[in-house]
Amino acid sequence: MSEAEARPTNFIRQIIDEDLASGKHTTVHTRFPPEPNGYLHIGHAKSICLNFGIAQDYKGQCNLRFDDTNPVKEDIEYVESIKNDVEWLGFHWSGNVRYSSDYFDQLHAYAIELINKGLAYVDELTPEQIREYRGTLTQPGKNSPYRDRSVEENLALFEKMRTGGFEEGKACLRAKIDMASPFIVMRDPVLYRIKFAEHHQTGNKWCIYPMYDFTHCISDALEGITHSLCTLEFQDNRRLYDWVLDNITIPVHPRQYEFSRLNLEYTVMSKRKLNLLVTDKHVEGWDDPRMPTISGLRRRGYTAASIREFCKRIGVTKQDNTIEMASLESCIREDLNENAPRAMAVIDPVKLVIENYQGEGEMVTMPNHPNKPEMGSRQVPFSGEIWIDRADFREEANKQYKRLVLGKEVRLRNAYVIKAERVEKDAEGNITTIFCTYDADTLSKDPADGRKVKGVIHWVSAAHALPIEIRLYDRLFSVPNPGAADDFLSVINPESLVIKQGFAEPSLKDAVAGKAFQFEREGYFCLDSRHSTAEKPVFNRTVGLRDTWAKVGE
């Protein structure tokens, strides 16, 4: 398969192919322009993969530009987090990190150009009055009484804004377009507003800040962006994007193209709602493993490769749709099934004693991956007292139950065949110990007499067990579309986090955050980067071995 054939196909790439073939562009230059007022989520990952992926495939460039035009909501913490997320996903921006604030001087000059052309004016309506004058989708707006000020007066007032002569909310600069436009975004949009706030890049140099729609298009043009890619909610804004560039003296006029944003089941993407989850302590932070943030997914154990694969599979269209959570989980499950080493851990332990086992114990050899001999093997201690999972034993069971049953046999993974002989219970009737015998001639081989032992269960030697905390993470919400609920907080899944105390094989004491394991027969887990200690490792469940929610949706 050629390089071109291996590339994903979508309407944006078709446009790029046509632009290159026609000579309209000789290279491709994209950008990813997040606002540094929060943490990136899986929806941003789609945009990152699209913009950086296109630049990569077409041997072009992709800028990382922070849209830092609102100093009240932005912070250097978010800047560093976003840079880290982009790099973790496997992408690298062209040249230095850029900021919209790099262009504040040019933006100010372009605003003055619009004033000089009679295309912008200083308005002294209050924000409430501006909203009232703007009209509705069915009613046209009406002109501000300040709309027809002279060029000279507007220049003087804009300078007064710049030098701090107005209080916040007392004046703004607006484009003079058409208050009767069927598109509300074109009804004299605000270009500059006053904010007396220190900026994380420019300090206190400015007290007027440009709006996104004014900044975005000019920044694209100044950077030589060829294809400006936005989500569909900016479709109407394209008219303003083009209006600004058509009416200022700038040599380059990029084109904006819109694609559908990512909507994912069982979560919310709204920054406001995510912030509410954090501030009201429904989750422990932006990197809580239940959050759809990139930092949350990373802490849960998602790999960059699995997120890139997910973004590739869902594709790029103009059609809004909601992606099943199972699609994302399938990508990480496939990745980890292929690449994660195996280990044994018991999540709900019950003691099992092998009464006829002699000696202190022994080491058994286990492959790190059943299908990849190149991943090697490890030595796991075995002894006469082990932990097994409580769900792997029943006193009575039907033929479909392939685990340990009283009076019957089962194989211990990569070890011996055992037979359950009797149990010991506490005063409440709970089983505390299972007593067994073992066949000493069945270490990793079938019984010599040819009898069939069908079930296989995992185990951990009690004498060598590593105590661990296991965090069983699940979907944060109990309904597919929590955003549609009257109160999205009311549909939080009460079992989105279940904490268990269990035991693991001793090799897991060397586990490091960011490296996943398949806990055999349980699922995929990784060491938690926040709560783990040397004395008590904490493992997060990334995803189960199979989609347990499939039946829920049926």
From Swiss-Prot:
Q: Where is the signal peptide?
A: none
Q: Which Pfam families does the annotation name? A: tRNA-synt_1c (PF00749), tRNA-synt_1c_C (PF03950), tRNA-synt_1c_C2 (PF20974)
What Gene Ontology cellular-component terms does the record carry? cytosol
Q: Where does the UniProt annotation locate this protein?
A: Cytoplasm
Q: What is its EC number?
A: 6.1.1.18
Key word Phosphoprotein present in the record? no
Q: Which UniProt keywords apply?
A: Aminoacyl-tRNA synthetase, ATP-binding, Cytoplasm, Ligase, Nucleotide-binding, Protein biosynthesis
**Molecular function as annotated in GO:** ATP binding; glutamine-tRNA ligase activity
Region entry Interaction with tRNA: which residue ranges? Answer: 317-324
Listed binding positions for L-glutamine are D67, Y212
Q: Which InterPro entries match?
A: aa-tRNA-synth_I_CS, Gln-tRNA-synth, Gln/Glu-tRNA_Ligase, Gln_tRNA_ligase_bac, Glu/Gln-tRNA-synth, Glu/Gln-tRNA-synth_Ib_cat-dom, Glu/Gln-tRNA-synth_Ib_codon-bd, Glu_tRNA_lig_a-bdl
Q: Its domain of life?
A: Bacteria
What reaction is this protein's catalytic activity? tRNA(Gln) + L-glutamine + ATP = L-glutaminyl-tRNA(Gln) + AMP + diphosphate
Q: What is this protein called?
A: Glutamine--tRNA ligase
Q: Which gene encodes it?
A: glnS
